[in-house]
């Protein structure tokens, strides 16, 4: 299996990819380096495919990878309570149904100008 090292140890690389994948699912668009964008594309595609399956085993597999972060918080005036949605709930309830008719290719990578400071090639990765 080929992958990019991204200048990190394996545990650091896996943690970074989990964080970036979760951020992309929450925000639906992030700015990162080209190499990182190409690497997280693989995991995001797998997570959305799990979301499309939608069964309990797929939900548990996705929960083992996606961080438990709050995606959105809403205030309900009637009950005077805040309700929050996690990244996993957003994946299964909002993102996966959007791609029900699409077989792969859920992300788009747009190259942008190099980063100031070290001229690293930058890219925007977003959900289509």
Curated annotation (Swiss-Prot):
Domain of life, source organism: Bacteria
Disulfide bonds: none
Any one Gene Ontology BP term: translation
Gene3D superfamilies found in the cross-reference section: Ribosomal protein L17 (3.90.1030.10)
GO cellular component: cytosolic large ribosomal subunit
Keywords annotated in UniProt: Ribonucleoprotein, Ribosomal protein
InterPro entries named in the record: Ribosomal_bL17, Ribosomal_bL17_CS, Ribosomal_bL17_sf
The family this protein is said to belong to: Belongs to the bacterial ribosomal protein bL17 family.
HAMAP family the record matches: Ribosomal_bL17
Oligomer and partners: Part of the 50S ribosomal subunit. Contacts protein L32.
Name recorded for this polypeptide: Large ribosomal subunit protein bL17
